Amino acid sequence: MKKAVILFNLGGPDKLENVEPFLFNLFYDPAILNLPKFLRYPLAKLISNRRAPTAKKIYEELGGASPILKLTIDQSNSLENKLNDEDQNNEYKCFIVMRCWHPRAANVIHEVKNFNPDEVILLPLYPQYSAATSGSSIKEWHTVCKKNDYNVKTSTICCYPTEANFIDAHIEEIYKKIKDLKNYKLIFSAHGLPEKNIKKGDPYQWQVEQSVNKIVNKMNIKNLDWILSYQSRVGPLKWIGPSTEDVIVENSKIGKKIALVPIAFVSEHSETLVELDIEYKELADKNGCVEYVRIPALGVNVNFISSLSNLVINKEDNKLTENLYPPKIQCPSNFKKCPCLNYE
């Protein structure tokens, strides 16, 4: 059988003149701005126009473009090779779909149709599910399929916050950086969300907590000083916390070394390479931090690629039901945005 694996990620501008249209695509997403289209369009234009100058400075730090597509291609190639090595009864081909920049679903679907798979497997590169990330990408894919009258067996791997190899991949990368550190604060930093999203039933924060708890318990380091915090807050709304910035300032001032783990990002991009590596390091230095280390995103870590491969290959063994994996509901029932409870 031929199987197409669709890897979803956010995307990023490939040159400075595309920063503003990238931002427009981000804010025009109804999962980000939940407004009627006639209001969402002008507001997205306004926000993207106002934020473009600051965002361009960020991408100038990265050489004028986001590295996320190249890094996702590396992940895609590694996963495709792993899948075809591990399961020689099927032929796998991986495709990349970015939500806010190229390659977009509307273009990639034609490549998928040319491959003519017996099954399409949707695999977000977001380990923890949120309606604003995985949910938005999955929804767009189904919309594009409907527009193109494309009907094929489709399975969805919605999330994998506690998958064993995913956890091991993080532990491996953390150990490399902390093995010689003393008197440090281990900070797990995830992208934040407005508090109202969580109150409406988005399982993201709960799933991030499950990831971190699993890692900390498996590391089993006596008296490990750790915390989970959230970064990248924008706008006037109240966001989930504590904020990574506040945690860095507080611990730098009391003489703690900082070890920072990007727990919800699996590839490097502006929010790791600029926000974590430059802006937050400057913040730590300014407040007296004597040493600041940043654990890398998982990238093509062997355990992480094995995690993705296991999810794709073993979903049948785990009795995939109603085209959604994981088969057992992981999230408590109050998280109504969890696709296992209420697929959108």
Residue ranges and their predicted role:
Residues 1-344:
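Active-site-proximal alpha-helix that buttresses catalytic centers in soluble enzyme cores
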